[in-house]
Amino acid sequence: MRLTASAIAGQFGLTVLGDGSTEVSGVATLAHAGAGQLSFLSNPRYRPQLADSQAAVVVLRADDAEAAKGTALVAKDPYTAFAKIAALFDVAQVCEPGIHPSAFIDPTAQVSPGAHVGPFVSIGARSRVGDGCVIGTGSLIGADCVVDDGSELLARVTLVTRVRLGKRVRIHPGAVIGADGFGLAMDAGHWIKVPQLGGVVIGDDCEIGANTCIDRGALEDTVLEEDVRVDNLVQIAHNCRIGAHSAIAGCSGIAGSAKIGRYCLLGGHVGVVGHLEICDKVVITGKSVVRNSINEPGEYSSGTPLTDNRTWRKNAARFKQLDVLARRILAVGKEKE
């Protein structure tokens, strides 16, 4: 596919600087773009690459336009504009409607004639798959699940039981949704299992990364509101609620019954303690541990910054002495009084 710079600008409301007839057939980074490829400049860190870039077209802010040596598309947010343009060149494999002969469909399940069910898929009792859905190879949909219109399960996705997906949900390979929550009670020195009788509800336009696990609730449902984005290898425990338009980066873990507000961002490897609440529009930086509820929007961090090992070891040793040192300082202050 080839598009002119003018056609792209018209579709996304951008301003053309230079030759609007320049053709684009693909996208690439500034450093590696070549003839016929479009790139973007969003982070000032990469501004030095602009002068040497061989990109046919560059999406950038007005402030950077003078440095562009070829055709440019001016956008308020170059990264968002680039994401929309790149989608034009992301040609997905077309899956024709139909059920593969190797798939198993329970007699009580309902599968839309417009859905695609791939090889070795299993769909359990009373489950429903909507129009335009794609169920990838080897996926398992257990009993009493709903996959609403336009949703896609890539290869080997598991919906255990009582999982309800909204419209246009996308789940990547290996994800497990609706497994038992980690509910245990101690009885006479032995653990007994607390039945997990709830389900999982995932709203419209959510995306779940590869090998992520979202457990079903004990009594009520675990809920992801609409347009939540979850990266790979994330654990969301039972009875959590994730607010709309929030995003959670890889290797994060959210303990049971935690509530995260709308438009929140969690960096990689963030830990959230159970039974607390995070308000709307909170950013938690990577490797942080959230031990208390957060009631004010803003950016929060925890942990020790990276330093050379020798300095870190000295500081770690001093950390153990903080209480003793603090008591000495207080004692000196009282003596001076």
Curated annotation (Swiss-Prot):
Q: Show the InterPro entries listed in the entry.
A: Hexapep, LpxD, Trimer_LpxA-like_sf, UDP_GlcNAc_AcTrfase_non-rep
| The protein's Enzyme Commission number | 2.3.1.191
Q: Which SUPFAM superfamilies match?
A: Trimeric LpxA-like enzymes
Q: Which UniProt keywords apply?
A: Acyltransferase, Lipid A biosynthesis, Lipid biosynthesis, Lipid metabolism, Repeat, Transferase
**Group of enzyme by EC:** transferase
> In which pathway is this protein known to take part?
Bacterial outer membrane biogenesis; LPS lipid A biosynthesis
An example Gene Ontology cellular component term from the record?
membrane
Is Lipid biosynthesis a UniProt keyword of this protein? yes
What are its GO biological-process terms?
lipid A biosynthetic process
The task this protein performs is described as:
Catalyzes the N-acylation of UDP-3-O-acylglucosamine using 3-hydroxyacyl-ACP as the acyl donor. Is involved in the biosynthesis of lipid A, a phosphorylated glycolipid that anchors the lipopolysaccharide to the outer membrane of the cell.
Record note on quaternary structure: Homotrimer.
Question: What HAMAP family does UniProt report for this protein, alphabetically?
Answer: LpxD
Tell me its family.
Belongs to the transferase hexapeptide repeat family. LpxD subfamily.
Cite the PANTHER family for this sequence. Answer: UDP-3-O-ACYLGLUCOSAMINE N-ACYLTRANSFERASE (PTHR43378), UDP-3-O-ACYLGLUCOSAMINE N-ACYLTRANSFERASE 1, MITOCHONDRIAL-RELATED (PTHR43378:SF2)
- Record's protein name: UDP-3-O-acylglucosamine N-acyltransferase
Q: Which organism is it from?
A: Xanthomonas oryzae pv. oryzae (strain MAFF 311018)
